[in-house]
């Protein structure tokens, strides 16, 4: 009997020791391997090579994914050309040299080539515009030039579009949003005349664009004010201006009209006057009823310092 009691006591001590052991009381930990290395090769999906763009679009639509349509196109304008074709090269100083000199002979030969090309272009223009002549067109071109600049000073963009091409319009109005332009035509020093006519084909055969270069020598007044009313450039005194203005028309268009297309600036032309920019200087804030001259600025005198050597 005593032996059995000892045996039960020993078994109970062993069971209690096994339950209270630190290895038994520790929480179970699950160790999982983590991939830290970047995979530079991703195996392709099964059957990805056999899929076409149409199959992928159909699959996306079936899944309810709507992909926006991307158009790789940009609008173009065919009412006018993108530049001046075969621009006229004015002689230096706009003076005729003697035909006996080497430079004068070269200038005369160049003029004959340009005249022959202009005569061929005039024939093409008259096929679509029977009223076109080199005698009456310069006066019409000068009227377009004067009216377009009047609309520019008033910034009437709707009427300005009818007199200038889509290529010339941004060049005329760029930077004039906060400026005031005062322009006037005084008089013509010389009668305007046609110096060159070109009528090339563009894009397709038979699609003709006519460009006529008109020489204008007149007196103008131009003065530009900034948004604060200060003069940026120009003056109210009339000045002699020599310009070569290009007018263009889409001959195939039955409703096309002659419009100003651009200007040719000779390489020997004098540089333009620099524009005086307005800057804001830090200073005392003025009231609406005060002027800058009414304020007395206190001049800070230098503080004397003692130098010890």
From Swiss-Prot:
GO terms for cellular component: mitochondrial large ribosomal subunit; mitochondrion. Coiled coil: none annotated. InterPro entries: mtLSU_mL45, NTF2-like_dom_sf, Tim44-like_dom. One of its GO terms (molecular function) is structural constituent of ribosome. The keyword Ribonucleoprotein applies. GO terms for biological process: mitochondrial translation. It holds the Pfam family Tim44. Keywords: Mitochondrion, Ribonucleoprotein, Ribosomal protein, Transit peptide. Signal peptide: none annotated. Gene3D superfamilies: 3.10.450.240. The keyword Electron transport does not apply. Its main location: mitochondrion. It is found in: Mitochondrion. SMART domains: Tim44. Belongs to the mitochondrion-specific ribosomal protein mL45 family. Component of the mitochondrial large ribosomal subunit (mt-LSU). Within the mitochondrial ribosomes, required to direct the nascent polypeptide toward the tunnel exit and position the exit at a distance from the membrane surface. Component of the mitochondrial ribosome large subunit (39S) which comprises a 16S rRNA and about 50 distinct proteins. This is Large ribosomal subunit protein mL45.
């Amino acid at each position: 009997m005593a032996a059995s009691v000892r045996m039960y006591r020993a078994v109970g001590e062993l069971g209690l020791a096994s339950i209270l052991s630190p290895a038994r009381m520790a929480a179970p930990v699950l160790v999982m391997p983590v991939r830290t290395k970047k995979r530079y090769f991703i195996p392709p999906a099964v059957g990805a090579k056999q899929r076409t763009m149409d199959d992928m679009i159909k699959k996306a639509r079936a899944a309810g994914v709507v992909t926006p349509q991307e158009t790789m196109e940009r609008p173009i304008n065919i009412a006018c050309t993108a530049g001046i074709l075969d621009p006229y090269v004015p002689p230096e100083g706009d003076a005729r040299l003697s035909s006996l000199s080497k430079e004068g002979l070269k200038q005369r030969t160049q003029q004959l080539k340009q005249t022959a090309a202009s005569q061929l272009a005039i024939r093409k223009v008259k096929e679509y515009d029977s009223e076109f002549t080199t005698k009456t067109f310069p006066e019409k071109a000068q009227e377009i030039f004067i009216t377009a600049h009047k609309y520019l000073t008033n910034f009437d963009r709707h009427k300005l579009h009818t007199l200038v091409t889509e290529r010339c319009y941004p060049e005329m109005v760029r930077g004039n949003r906060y400026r005031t332009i005062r322009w006037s035509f005084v008089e013509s020093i010389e009668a305007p005349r046609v110096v060159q006519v070109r009528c090339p084909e563009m894009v397709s055969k038979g699609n003709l664009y006519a460009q006529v270069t008109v020489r204008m020598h007149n007196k103008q007044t131009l003065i530009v004010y900034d948004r604060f009313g200060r003069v940026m450039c120009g003056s109210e005194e009339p000045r002699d201006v020599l310009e070569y203005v290009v007018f263009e028309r889409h001959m195939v268009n039955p409703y096309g009209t002659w419009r100003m297309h651009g200007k040719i600036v000779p390489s020997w032309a004098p540089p333009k006057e620099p524009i005086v920019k307005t800057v804001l200087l830090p200073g005392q804030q003025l009231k609406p009823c005060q002027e800058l001259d009414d304020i007395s600025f206190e001049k800070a005198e230098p503080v004397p310092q003692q130098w010890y050597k």
